[in-house]
Structure formats: structure tokens, C-alpha cells
Amino acid sequence: MGNLISTCSFSSRVNSTAKITDSSIWYPQPDQHISIRTFRELNQAPTSSPTSTRTEMFLNGVLSRSTDDLQGEDSRQPMTLTPRQLTQDVSRRLLM
């Protein structure tokens, strides 16, 4: 396994207490193979598993990419939510 590369982004709304943190971890592999795992945290409560895995590989000058959604079809949410949608989504998830 190669060197660890990590990124993190944070977003929140002025009128909401909800905070979302996205972080990605890269493990470059031999032959320029990169595995990316993305985690999402809501109000800094850690998730138990990655939400998606993306793999990029360069072989003979050709880039090959694949993305696996590890949450399934039912849990896919739009990436852009209005403050009202975000509040409703957070409330629904907290009441589950």
C-alpha cells in the first residue's frame, strides 16, 4: 500500500445546527493505482463505513475509473439541498 493522502471539507447553514463533514482517503497503489474512500459525517457523528469507493487506474497510458455506491439505491440523496430539505432530512434520520 502506498502513502496515505487525505482531504476534508466542511459545510453548514447559517440558520441550521446541522453540519456536514466530507472526507476522502487515498491509498496510491503500485502502478499508479488509486483507491478513494469517502466518508460523510452529520453533526460530527462518525459513520461506520464508507459511503462510496472510487478507483482510478492508469495502465499503458489509459485511465480507468469506477465508483461503487456502498449505501444502495434507497439511500442516495441529492448533493444540493435547500435549508428546508436539509432540516427535514436530518429530522427524519434522527427519528429513525
Curated annotation (Swiss-Prot):
Main location per the UniProt record: host cell
Composition skew (Polar residues), residue ranges: 77-89
Region (Disordered): 66-96
Family matches, as InterPro entries: Gemini_C4
Bilayer topology annotation: Lipid-anchor
Intracellular or extracellular location(s): Host cell membrane
Keyword Membrane listed: yes
Pfam families, sorted: Gemini_C4
Domain of life: Viruses
Organism field: Tomato yellow leaf curl Sardinia virus (isolate Spain-2) (TYLCSV)
Protein function: Pathogenicity determinant. May act as a suppressor of RNA-mediated gene silencing, also known as post-transcriptional gene silencing (PTGS), a mechanism of plant viral defense that limits the accumulation of viral RNAs.
Entry keyword Iron-sulfur: no
Keyword annotations from UniProtKB, A to Z: Host cell membrane, Host membrane, Host-virus interaction, Inhibition of host innate immune response by virus, Lipoprotein, Membrane, Myristate, Suppressor of RNA silencing, Viral immunoevasion
Protein name: Protein C4
